[in-house]
Amino acid sequence: MTMSGTAEEALRREYVIGEEIGRGRFGTVRRCYAAATGEPFALKTTPKAALRELEADPLDLALAEQEPKVHLLASAASRHVVALHAAFEDADAVHLVLDLCPGGDLFALVSARGPLPEPEAAGLVAQLADALAGCHRRGVAHRDVKPDNLLFDASGALRLGDFGSADWFGDGRPLTGLVGTPYYVAPEVVAGKEYTEKVDVWSAGVVLYMMLSGTVPFSGATAGDIFQAVLRGNVRFPPRAFAAVSPEAKDLMRRMLCKDVWRRLSAEQVLRHPWIVTRGGSVAVN
């Protein structure tokens, strides 16, 4: 993939572009290095041409163009957010220079190891909730929390990445739009309603369920079937997968996967839940 003119020139003055290390729906992620120091980073490039095609959703282009600003705001939210170090943008593409997270992602971890022990899962959820609480305090909703977007840095700490679906909220401005991933999206999003930042807590609840069982709570043969299961919102804990899971962990999942948004926990409340505090240890809020 070739990068765009002026943005590419500015980028290449400061960074040496390396090999491709990932690919998303619209763009690629490459390794890059600071020209002055040799420090490694990840470079996410989103070309705008595909987002301007007739059949493309205009929301996708709008989100790509605002991603640098939203991600910059989120970068200061928590040490568990993948930091944005530089952004280069012109009419053709958006290039983001990000923390390099060489430890893979949570989806790969659970795929390789199967269900995680409760203390480990609690520690990871604490880190995720810290990232979300920080973002929410700054008026940023991620809107695509899923294991693929939860990365591990060189020290093994969890980092929330990919703010390509993120948006601002607050001051009476509701969130709208069907964004996210079917297995992890909250029912109020599927229903086409206005919604709040608590959609991220629902998604984090699905992530916790997946960490403890190796499966997801809402599934189906098609995206439509999955959405119907999400709308029903019946959270079950099959004995085969959850026989060894504690009542406290199940209580937290029920509170995160609560269809009633007003009763659903906030990210801050997740951090204070007894299962997180006693098994995962509390994470210092930045």
Regions found by a protein language model. Name each.
Residues 28:
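Conserved N-lobe ATP-binding subsite of Hanks-type protein kinase domains
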Residues 46-74:
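Conserved N-lobe beta3->alphaC-helix segment of eukaryotic protein kinase catalytic domains
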Residues 82, 91-99, 107-108:
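A conserved loop-to-beta-strand element in the N-lobe of protein kinase catalytic cores
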Residues 87:
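Activation-segment/catalytic-loop signature of the eukaryotic protein kinase fold
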Residues 124-125:
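Activation segment signature within eukaryotic-like protein kinase domains
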Residues 200:
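Conserved catalytic-loop aspartate of Hanks-type protein kinases
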